C-alpha cells in the first residue's frame, strides 16, 4: 500500500538566511518521524553529478550488464515463475574511501570516472560531517560530538555502493533490494531522477522516495538511533523492481570506525538507556547475518551480550 503523503524535501541553502530556524526544525522532524529526507541546494556541483551519472550508466552497459545476465542464468532467475525472497535484482560494486581507498583496485573504470568519484566522495564526506553537526545542534550535543564518536582510533569508515537495478519482466516476483534498515551512521544517496523504486516504511505503509534531479537523499542508520537513544530513527526501506528503465543508485555510507564505541549520548538518557553499548565492528558482525530482519532483535542481542559481559568480567590474576 502506498500513501499520498508529503516526503520531506529540505533546501539546505536556507540555513544561511532568515529561514535557518525553520529549516533546522524540518531536519529535526524528518530525523524523528521519517528517518529520511531529501536535500536540494546542497552545494554539490551539478555538472559533477551529471558526469558521474553518465559514466556510471556507461560503465554498467559496458562492463556489468553481461555479468548481471549471467548471474540471472546461474541462479535460475532469467525465467521467474515463483516469488523469490532470498536474492536481490541488482548489479553492484563498492568503492572504499576511508580509512583506505580501493579506487585504483577496481577494474574497468576509466581514469575520468575514477577522478570524478574521488572528487565526489570527498565532497560527500564533507557534506556528511556538516550534516552530523546539524544533528548535534538539534540534539543539544556539542558540535563535533557525533564525528568524535564515529572516529574511533583510526577515523570513520566511508564507502560508496554503486548499483543498477535493470528492468525486470516480473516485478511482482522479486525485489530490487529487500527491506532492511542500514547498519551504520549516515547514508547519502544520489539516485536516478527518471526511474523510481526506492520506498520507506512510514506508519505501516510503504512510501515512495521521490526521484528529484540533482537531489541527495539522506537516511539514518542504526548507529544514530542508538546514539540518540531512540530520538532519531533508522527505518526499513526497499527497492522495487520496474518493468521499464534501469535505475541508478549511488549510496555513500559514512559509518563509525570499526573500533568505535557506540552508546547512547549521556545527555539524551533520562533514566535508563533504551539501547546497548557496543563496539561498531561487533554490531556489523551480527548485522551481516540479520540484515533483512527487524532491527529490534539485533539491539536486544547486543544488549544481552553487554549484560553477559557485565556479569562475567575478565578475571585478573595478581602475582606477588
From Swiss-Prot:
Q: What induces it?
A: Accumulates in response to very-long-chain fatty acids (VLCFAs C20:0 to C30:0).
Which GO cellular component does the record give, naming just one? cytosol
Please give the name of this protein.
Answer: 1-aminocyclopropane-1-carboxylate oxidase 3
Which top-rank group of organisms is this from? Eukaryota
Q: Which residues form the Fe2OG dioxygenase domain?
A: 155-256
Keywords on record: Coiled coil, Ethylene biosynthesis, Iron, Metal-binding, Oxidoreductase, Plant defense, Vitamin C
What is the originating organism of this protein? Arabidopsis thaliana
Task: Look up keyword Oxidoreductase and say if it applies.
Answer: yes
- Give the binding site residues for 2-oxoglutarate: 247
What reactions does this protein catalyze? 1-aminocyclopropane-1-carboxylate + L-ascorbate + O2 = ethene + L-dehydroascorbate + hydrogen cyanide + CO2 + 2 H2O
User: What Pfam family is a match, any one?
Assistant: DIOX_N
EC nos: 1.14.17.4
**Annotated residues for binding of Fe cation:** 180, 182, 237
Which pathway does it serve? Alkene biosynthesis; ethylene biosynthesis via S-adenosyl-L-methionine; ethylene from S-adenosyl-L-methionine: step 2/2
Function description: Enzyme involved in the ethylene biosynthesis. May promote stem elongation by maximizing the extensibility cells, possibly by activating ethylene biosynthesis, in response to very-long-chain fatty acids (VLCFAs C20:0 to C30:0).
Amino acid at each position: 500500500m502506498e500513501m499520498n503523503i508529503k516526503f520531506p524535501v529540505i533546501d539546505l541553502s536556507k540555513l544561511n538566511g532568515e529561514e535557518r530556524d525553520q529549516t533546522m526544525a524540518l531536519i529535526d522532524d524528518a530525523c524523528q518521524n521519517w528517518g529520511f529526507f531529501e536535500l536540494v541546494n546542497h552545494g554539490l556541483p551539478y555538472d559533477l553529478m551529471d558526469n558521474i551519472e553518465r559514466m556510471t550508466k556507461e560503465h554498467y552497459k559496458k562492463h556489468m550488464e553481461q555479468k548481471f545476465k549471467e548471474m540471472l542464468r546461474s541462479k535460475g532467475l532469467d525465467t521467474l515463475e515463483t516469488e523469490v525472497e532470498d536474492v536481490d535484482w541488482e548489479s553492484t560494486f563498492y568503492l572504499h574511501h576511508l580509512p583506505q581507498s580501493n579506487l585504483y583496485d577496481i577494474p574497468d573504470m576509466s581514469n575520468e570516472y575514477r577522478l570524478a568519484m574521488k572528487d565526489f566522495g570527498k565532497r560527500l564526506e564533507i557534506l556528511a560531517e556538516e550534516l552530523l553537526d546539524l544533528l548535534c545542534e538539534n540534539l543539544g550535543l556539542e558540535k563535533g560530538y557525533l564525528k568524535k564518536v564515529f572516529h574511533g582510533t583510526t577515523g570513520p569508515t566511508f564507502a560508496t555502493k554503486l548499483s543498477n537495478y535493470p528492468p525486470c519482466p516480473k516485478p511482482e516476483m522479486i525485489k530490487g533490494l529487500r527491506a532492511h534498515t542500514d547498519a551504520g551512521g549516515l547514508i547519502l544517496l544520489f539516485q536516478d531522477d527518471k526511474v523510481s523504486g526506492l520506498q520507506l516504511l512510514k506508519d505501516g505503509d510503504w512510501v515512495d522516495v521521490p526521484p528529484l534531479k540533482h537531489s541527495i537523499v539522506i537516511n539514518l542508520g542504526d548507529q544514530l538511533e542508538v546514539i540518540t537513544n531512540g530520538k532519531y530513527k533508522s527505518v526499513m526501506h526497499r527497492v522495487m523492481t520496474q518493468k521499464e528503465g534501469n535505475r541508478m543508485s549511488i549510496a555513500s555510507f559514512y559509518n563509525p570506525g570499526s573500533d568505535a564505541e557506540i552508546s547512547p549520548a549521556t545527555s539524551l538518557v533520562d533514566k535508563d538507556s533504551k539501547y546497548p553499548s557496543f563496539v561498531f565492528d561487533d554490531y556489523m558482525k551480527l548485522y551481516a547475518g540479520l540484515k533483512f530482519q527487524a532491527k529490534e532483535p539485533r539491539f536486544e542481542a547486543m544488549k544481552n551480550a553487554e549484560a553477559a559481559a557485565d556479569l562475567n568480567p575478565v578475571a585478573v590474576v595478581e602475582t606477588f
